[in-house]
């Protein structure tokens, strides 16, 4: 298969290099199109107000001065000579569990591939303080999952969000299909003073686990399993439709009232 590989940690990150090599070793034709620097937390942002510069590093690698979504969008809308068959994003050097997927550039790169018609997988290594030890485990998991997708494709609107514990392959207890858990609200922002005495802010840490019981991605990874969560992009809150429908009469009546 022709595999487009991207990430949000940047084209020089070890995770993407190990992933690309593992996929090549697995017999796939791999093209890497990734940000020229760390763009973690970029979510689904596209660059629309300035042109995007690219730089060929070698015949199979291109660095992009843009977001992860930019990278995949460009690659799938004319930048590459040959169309890929699948998008694999990662290996991210930290978890993308629960609510993390909303902010994750890793997941968003996969999501853009899915928007543009390709199967897509996001792969993250659940590290402690970003100290990764077993990218090879996550890469091997990715190769296995790509093979399964080729043999048994999923519905066209499905993205696989994969989180891998930072363990040796022989220590992983298995794969689990999971749902997204969620976290408590984020920790407070962190104010500091710059050298001129002005206040600046750092975004605070993600909140601790909240919904993290059996069946969630949090629980699977915590118990030594590789979590596979099928996700899609329909954000409709179906349980609220009836309540909001009850508002419609009053809202419509307000249109006839005074301006």
Curated annotation (Swiss-Prot):
Q: Which UniProt keywords apply?
A: Cytoplasm, Hydrolase, Metal-binding, Nucleotide-binding
Single GO molecular-function term?
nucleotide binding
Q: Which InterPro entries match?
A: SurE, SurE-like_Pase/nucleotidase, SurE-like_sf
Where is this chain primarily localised?
cytoplasm
Q: Which reaction does it catalyse?
A: a ribonucleoside 5'-phosphate + H2O = a ribonucleoside + phosphate
Identify the Pfam families for this entry: SurE
Q: Which family does it belong to?
A: Belongs to the SurE nucleotidase family.
So what does this one do?
Nucleotidase that shows phosphatase activity on nucleoside 5'-monophosphates.
Q: How is the cofactor bound?
A: Binds 1 divalent metal cation per subunit.
Q: What is this protein called?
A: 5'-nucleotidase SurE
| Listed cofactors | a divalent metal cation
Gene3D superfamilies per record: Survival protein SurE-like phosphatase/nucleotidase
Indicate yes or no for the key word rRNA-binding.
Answer: no
Provide the E.C. number(s) assigned to this enzyme.
3.1.3.5
Cellular localization per UniProt: Cytoplasm
List cellular component terms (GO).
Answer: cytoplasm
């Amino acid at each position: 298969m022709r595999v487009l590989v991207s990430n949000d940690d940047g084209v020089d990150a070890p995770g993407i290099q190990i992933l690309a090599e593992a996929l090549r070793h697995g017999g796939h034709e791999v093209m890497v199109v990734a940000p020229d620097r760390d763009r973690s937390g970029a979510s689904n942002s596209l660059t629309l107000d300035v042109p995007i510069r690219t730089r060929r590093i070698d015949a199979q690698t291109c660095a992009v001065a843009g977001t992860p979504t930019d990278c995949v969008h460009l690659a799938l809308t004319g930048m590459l000579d040959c169309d890929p068959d699948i998008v694999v994003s990662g290996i991210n050097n930290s978890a993308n569990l629960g609510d993390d997927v909303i902010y994750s550039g890793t997941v968003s790169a996969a999501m853009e591939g899915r928007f543009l018609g390709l199967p897509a997988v996001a792969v993250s290594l659940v590290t402690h303080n970003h100290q990764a030890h077993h990218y090879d485990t996550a890469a091997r998991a990715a190769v296995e999952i790509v093979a399964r997708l080729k043999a048994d494709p999923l519905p066209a609107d499905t993205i696989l969000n994969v989180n891998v514990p930072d363990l040796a392959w022989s220590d992983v207890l298995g794969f689990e299909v999971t749902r997204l858990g969620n976290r408590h609200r984020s920790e407070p922002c962190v104010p500091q003073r710059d050298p001129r005495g002005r206040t600046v802010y750092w975004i605070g840490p993600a909140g601790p686990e909240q919904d993290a019981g059996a069946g969630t991605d949090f629980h699977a990874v915590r118990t030594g399993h590789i979590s596979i969560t099928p996700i899609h992009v329909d954000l409709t809150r179906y349980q609220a439709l009836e309540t909001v429908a009850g508002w419609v009469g009053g809202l419509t009546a307000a249109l006839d009232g005074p301006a």
